């Protein structure tokens, strides 16, 4: 048993990164949805460029806008359309354009110094290789994130960095579940900018309410909001 498990997202939580995620909306017969650009505009989502692939036209959103897109799409009635994604720009972390969110990094460093505690990074980025609509590419996120954190004084080993390779919040929740069951922490502190990820972690309260205290903490522009405990 440990006292605390600290879980941090990377993009837009520990650091501001420059990466775009492509989204294409496809009709049941396989054609592009001609209304998708208007849907983006109506929801105040602004793509910075577009690219045509064999599966459709991809509209590329900055990572923080993609998090907003996820929340809107999850609650919208999309009918029989299907959204597909291009995460190629998230295959690695560029240290030249990545800026630390110093306030959250400070929390991470303090967490590292806590006795009988564990710190892990869980990111939606891909791990070793990634399938994209434009071909397979190698991913270096685990190594890149470890090197970036080391450069700012945070010694998180690669074995404590988990690129789950999916924007599905349940994938992050599954990593946290494994650590709860393995280490039986008294408290879990989960930091993320994405409300869907925070909601998925909060759902673990029902499963582990007699085992651990779970706190979901939203990060916005490098600032943390008050922790949301289990009900």
Language-model features, listed with the residues they occupy:
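Solvent-exposed loop/turn segments at secondary-structure junctions
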Residues: 13-14, 126-129, 194-197, 222-224
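Conserved Lys-Pro-Asp/Glu-containing loop-to-beta segment of HAD-superfamily phosphomonoesterases
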Residues: 4-6, 172-201
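A short acidic, often aromatic-flanked loop/helix-cap motif at beta-alpha or helix-coil junctions
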Residues: 166-174, 222-227
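Surface-exposed alpha-helical segments enriched in charged/polar residues
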Residues: 105-113, 177, 181, 199, ...
